[in-house]
From Swiss-Prot:
Alphabetical GO biological process terms: translation
PANTHER family cross-referenced by the UniProt entry: MITOCHONDRIAL RIBOSOMAL PROTEIN L24 (PTHR12903)
Family in the record: Belongs to the universal ribosomal protein uL24 family.
Name this polypeptide is given: Large ribosomal subunit protein uL24
GO molecular function: rRNA binding; structural constituent of ribosome
Organism: Francisella philomiragia subsp. philomiragia (strain ATCC 25017 / CCUG 19701 / FSC 153 / O#319-036)
UniProt keyword terms in alphabetical order: Ribonucleoprotein, Ribosomal protein, RNA-binding, rRNA-binding
Pfam families tied to this protein: KOW, ribosomal_L24
Organism domain of life: Bacteria
Subunit structure, as described in the record: Part of the 50S ribosomal subunit.
HAMAP family from the UniProt entry: Ribosomal_uL24_B
This protein's record includes keyword Nucleotide-binding: no
């Protein structure tokens, strides 16, 4: 189960960008892929197409990473953390498992 939401601050825990941080922009493939700002940037060669107004050249593009390769970043501990759910005032909220602080303030 994916416990990330759009706008969460995450850290990459596996892969070529391991240790880098970013913000979740969107999800793909039912939530199994996560598009993170500034992570997994690739260079794509684009052919010019005057009909569409596209110039040719090398374009940098962000590709999604697997959700299992990112973890939510806990600013209090400055490390990756796990997320749990609990009820506060009859409202379901997320909290960091390491120190019990709420994720959604």
């Amino acid at each position: 189960m994916n416990r990330l939401k759009k706008g969460d601050d995450v850290i990459v825990i596996a892969g070529k960008d391991k240790g880098r941080r970013g913000v979740v922009k969107s999800f793909a493939k039912g939530g199994s892929l996560v598009l993170v700002e500034g992570i997994n940037i690739v260079k794509k060669h684009v052919k010019p197409n005057p009909n569409r107004g596209v110039e040719g050249g090398v374009v940098e593009k962000e590709l999604p990473v697997d959700a299992s390769n990112v973890a939510i970043f806990n600013p209090a501990t400055e490390k990756a953390d796990r997320v749990g759910y609990k009820f506060v005032d009859e409202k379901k909220v997320r909290y960091f498992k390491s120190n019990g602080e709420l994720v959604d303030l």
